[in-house]
From Swiss-Prot:
One GO cellular component, as annotated: cytoplasm
Keyword set, alphabetical order: Cytoplasm, Pentose shunt, Schiff base, Transferase
Name this polypeptide is given: Transaldolase 1
Membership in a protein family: Belongs to the transaldolase family. Type 2 subfamily.
Metabolic or biological pathway: Carbohydrate degradation; pentose phosphate pathway; D-glyceraldehyde 3-phosphate and beta-D-fructose 6-phosphate from D-ribose 5-phosphate and D-xylulose 5-phosphate (non-oxidative stage): step 2/3
GO molecular function: transaldolase activity
This protein's encoding gene: tal1
Keyword Protein biosynthesis found: no
Its EC number(s): 2.2.1.2
Subcellular localization: Cytoplasm
The species this protein was found in: Streptomyces coelicolor (strain ATCC BAA-471 / A3(2) / M145)
Length: 381
């Protein structure tokens, strides 16, 4: 348990992030974290103003069984299917977390205090099913501060437009490439235009675009290490930051453009960039690298708890480390390409792997819940 005095001493870097316009979200959720008061404590002591979840997070939380036994027993008695059971458990957690964050949501005018829940990853390549699932999740959670996560696959793009057009706030996930990010922003603007035409108040619609960071370095650095030249080794740890910085440049251009300006006149909100996958995988780098080097106004950084703790303990927040660095970012990516590492190939591979990883985690979760339901005498099929 962190005391108030300890929190004051350790949260300095996190407060400096907030001062720079960066919203700190926690990339984790479990029933124990909610019921123990830990989430509320992180809000009080570590500047946490939002929560993101994904299939892997729920697989770890529910798969452990801790805190879910009573609900599992109830669901088994009712004879629900395994898919229904998983949805009831995950939406219950998100609803409870949304209630914990409601004060933040109200105080920020809806900008923060958000909890994200992802559509079934098995639907990543089915537009109509994704839209239907997003609507159902919004209805099931039934909280104004929920965000529905939709993957930025080709099929996900029109789904984003439809869901935003229905007035539902969206967290677009699994973005790796600059080209796809531009398509995501276009889908968001099209959704706002659709909502406006339907007479929906645009002020109530919020969105973030989750741009994945560390996975880009992991894959590109692996290829650079195989090359083994001095130039190649010197570029390790730079591609992901360059990619993210150029994404921020694209964000600035789009949301300063005429199309969004017209929507802003109707009280529309810009879709904020969210830095995801910010836990550092390579021990050769500072464990706060993707926090310190991606400080820019109007962004979100969602962190696993280990990264959050590291940032609070020894984070070095020096102000904006993104804007103005675009020329160097372009040079870094060009250097990687020149060495024969294909950016397009890497980001396409990462998108495919990202969808596959979430689907695999979801299948593991379904298997674990099926086993729990079966052990209580009810068929989970």
């Amino acid at each position: 348990m962190i005391t108030v005095t300890e929190a004051t001493a350790t949260a300095g870097a996190l407060q400096r992030l907030a001062d720079q316009g960066v919203s700190v979200w926690l990339d984790d959720l479990s029933r124990r974290r909610i019921e123990s008061g830990n989430l509320a404590e992180l809000i009080r002591t570590k500047n946490v103003v939002g929560v993101t979840t994904n299939p892997s997070i729920f697989q770890a939380a529910i798969g452990s069984g801790e805190g879910y036994e009573e609900q599992l027993a109830d669901l088994a008695t009712r004879g629900v299917t395994v898919d229904e059971a998983v949805r009831m458990m995950t939406t219950a957690d998100v609803r409870a977390a949304a209630d914990v964050l409601r004060g933040v949501y109200d105080a920020s005018g809806g900008r923060d205090g958000r909890v994200s829940i992802e559509v079934d990853p098995r639907l990543a390549h089915d537009t109509a099913a994704t839209v239907a699932e997003a609507r159902q999740l919004s209805w099931l959670v039934d909280r104004p501060n929920v965000m529905i996560k939709i993957p930025a696959t080709k099929a996900g793009l029109p789904a984003i437009t439809e869901v935003i057009g229905a007035g539902i706030s969206v967290n677009v996930t699994l973005i790796f490439s600059l080209e796809r990010y531009r398509e995501v922003m276009d889908a968001y603007l099209a959704g706002l235009e659709k909502a406006q035409a339907a007479g929906i108040d645009l002020a109530g619609i919020h969105s973030v675009a989750s741009f994945f960071v560390s996975r880009v370095d992991s894959e590109i650095d692996k290829r650079l290490s195989l090359l083994g030249t001095e130039e190649a080794l010197g570029l390790r740890g730079r591609a992901a930051l360059a990619n993210a910085r150029l994404a921020y440049e694209a964000y600035e251009n789009v949301f300063a453009g005429d199309r969004f300006t017209a929507l802003a006149g109707a009280r529309a909100n810009a879709q904020r960039p969210l830095w995801a996958s910010t836990g550092v995988k390579d021990p050769a780098f500072r464990d706060t690298l993707y926090v310190e080097e991606l400080v820019a106004p109007g962004t979100v950084n969602t962190m696993p708890e280990a990264t959050l703790d590291a940032a609070a303990d020894h984070g070095d927040v020096r102000g904006d480390t993104v804007t103005g660095g675009y020329a160097q970012a372009r040079a870094d990516l060009a250097a990687v390409e020149r060495l024969g590492v294909s950016y397009d190939e890497v980001v396409e591979q990462l998108e495919q792997e990202g969808v596959a990883k979430f689907e695999a985690a979801w299948q593991e979760l379904l298997a674990a819940v099926t086993k729990s339901l079966d052990s209580k005498g009810v068929d989970g099929e």
